[in-house]
Amino acid sequence: MDYRELADRVLNRLKQSKGDGRWDDHLSLATWEWPQGVAMYAMLKVYESSHDEKLLAEIKAWYDGHIARGLPGRNINTTAPMLGLTLLYETTKEEKYAPFIADWAEWIMHGLPRTEEGGFQHLTSDCINEQQLWDDTLFMTCLFLYRAGCALKKPAWQEEAKYQFLLHIKYLHCGKTGLWYHGWCFLGRHHFGEAFWARGNSWITAGAIDFAEWLPENDPVRRIVTETWLEQCRALLQCQDPETGLWHTLLDHPDSYLETSASAAIAYGLLKGCRMGLLSCRDQAMAAVRGVVGMIGPDGLVDGVSYGTPMGMDLDFYRRVPIQPTAYGQGLTFLMLTQLMDAFG
């Protein structure tokens, strides 16, 4: 299979999508929000391996256009594109990007609302989410904060990102199952619907291994993050649907629908773990790949993606989330394909 051609098809479908630029425009690249941030991160990772200058020019044009128009209000989700901007800065060394990175990182450090114990409250474009920790936060915000600290030589930012990973592990990782709850609330001290939601888990499967790889090998936080990630991966392999290779949107409830974006992100993490010598599950990882590839239409549109999902107070909430093509569905599938190009293709 030509994974590069497939990746191009998925990416081109995303670039062709037109939207209205609202914060809830989840398919097109017209918006500066978390779905587009996921897609930009994937595109930068492809550039790192391909050195495709046309792709780099498209990424630069996207960021330059949004900066010229003015960046949106700051929250956890609008932070997601900043990770790609930081990688772009590290790649191009264009100093014009540094002030935007520094200003946003300082807002995270000093302006973002905090929960008890100093956690990053999952503030979004439409909800305060008082005293709430979500696993999404680690991918959307903490990856950026750590890389910004690396790029601009700000060790305090790096240490804060490490602390946030440890705090989220403390409250969201289930030691009994190895899986992650979607969220935790200090008001009432509960896990909401106690859902082991697939995409929430997949942010960890994809994001934690990238984060751990960036840390020094002798860093104890790297060891903790890696071991927690390995425990999650072992649990995920037990939940995989044997017929399709995909995962259900509620990981431990086979009556819930199979979900593509989570499966793509999980496959990315498993493939990367195999490449790094941390896992030996290539057959199951490739079964997931085949399942995801089977959801890609002739025009590159990725099907079977659950729409943006806020916190649910019961499991039926997650079962009822509609299926809809999204930028993060395209982006996470594209991210998975980067590992196929690097590791097995």
What are these regions, as identified by a protein language model?
Residues 9, 13, 42-45, 65, ...:
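Alpha-helical scaffold segments in carbohydrate-active enzymes
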Residues 11-13, 20-30, 70, 171, ...:
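His/Met- and acidic-residue-enriched segments that coordinate or traffic transition-metal cofactors
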Residues 205-251:
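Oxyanion-binding "anion nests"
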